[in-house]
Amino acid sequence: MPIQNSPYKAFATLLNSGGHKVSPAELHGLLLGRSCAGAGFDNEGWFADASMLLETEPQDNIRAALVGLQEMVKGELTGDDMTVVLLLPGDDEPLTERAAALGQWCQGFLAGFGLAIGDKVLGSEAKAVLEDLAAIAQVQDALEESEDGETDYMEVMEYMRVAPLLLFTEFNEPAEPQPKPSLH
């Protein structure tokens, strides 16, 4: 039985209720891109970039959702296991819809990364990752509803779970290790 209200659908409904035409995937990509480029996790900078994509100042309920999304991303990028979960339609949705959302995610990521990177020098690995994301954003309509299309999509998804981590590691200062409390 498919999930009736996936996180993606719930966020899309919230954005639509506020009159915002942006997809949750593009918004999540924007956040992850700016975070990976070293923008940090302050709410005001995130709200400013999100407002630009939303084209208006977000209402309180959407601001609260944006804070929650940022906290989730911060936990994923700075946690011990460093795992990224992309905000995309579920596997029960048509491949064309999932591929389109993946392309939107890549567009958002590239925009967020570009906004935050400033004059930092990109290494060859970072350039290659960004070129890959730009290519993925362009082929969003090329995947067909077929077993091969599903396989291609899953391979791209595996790459997408790792690519942001490579960029985050390159452009963010490692967290200071917290001293463990001593037992006396």
From Swiss-Prot:
Coiled coil: none
HAMAP family per record: UPF0149
Domain of life: Bacteria
Pfam family, one: UPF0149
Matching InterPro entries: YgfB-like, YgfB-like_sf
Species this chain originates from: Pseudomonas syringae pv. tomato (strain ATCC BAA-871 / DC3000)
Family recorded in the similarity comment: Belongs to the UPF0149 family.
NCBIfam families: PRK02166.1
Identification of the protein by name: UPF0149 protein PSPTO_5224
GO cellular component: cytosol
